[in-house]
Design a protein with these regions (language model features):
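Structural signal for hydrophobic/aromatic residues that build the beta-strand cores
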Residues: 51, 73, 89-91, 105, ...
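Non-catalytic linker/capping segments at the edges of enzyme domains
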Residues: 1-33
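Active-site helix/loop of acyl-thioester processing domains in fatty-acid/polyketide metabolism
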Residues: 24, 42-65
Length: 161
């Protein structure tokens, strides 16, 4: 999995954060055949886990402690996820209020089948093809929204002897 994140100062009047930061994360990854729930289809639970993990990385910039826990995660599956594809997961923090942060994202894949040659060297896909907002021919697999909460104990340091 390749992940890139961007943090910026809050520019919107509707966003209020204690850190003044919003963030975006783009993750690119390959899902192979061993992660299928039914033959030929990637297990939906895996997609939910990927959303949760990347969402957590995204909202961590919004909290002083860098720790956020999932309070609610809603995933809307749009099309079946197919194996042996390159997936792009784009997420952003949409709102932060105190210890709460809302995040949303979308997962797409490029329809090109990317076989791994017998020499083991993976096919190379240009970054520009993966990172465009609406890459030509990309297929929307799922959209998700989540609420993360910074735990009250996050700022407490416990030192064990």
């Amino acid at each position: 999995m390749w992940t890139s994140s961007q943090t910026s100062k809050s520019k919107s009047n509707t966003e209020s954060t204690s850190t003044g930061k919003t963030s975006r994360v783009v993750s690119v990854f390959h899902i192979g055949r061993d992660l299928c729930g039914h033959p030929g289809f990637v297990h939906g639970g895996l997609l939910s886990v990927l959303f949760d993990e990347v969402f957590a990385r995204c909202v961590s910039a919004a909290f002083p402690s860098g720790l956020g826990m999932t309070a609610n995660l809603n995933v809307d599956f749009r099309k079946p996820a197919l194996p042996d594809r390159m997936y792009v997961l784009q997420v952003e923090t949409t709102k932060v209020e105190g210890r709460k942060a809302w995040v949303q994202g979308r997962m797409t894949y490029l329809p090109v089948h990317l076989p791994v040659p017998s020499d083991g060297i993976e096919a190379i896909v240009p970054d520009s093809a993966l990172l465009r907002e609406d890459a030509e021919g990309s297929v929307m697999v799922a959209e998700a929204k989540a609420l993360f909460i910074e735990p009250k104990f996050a700022d407490v340091s416990i030192i064990f002897p």
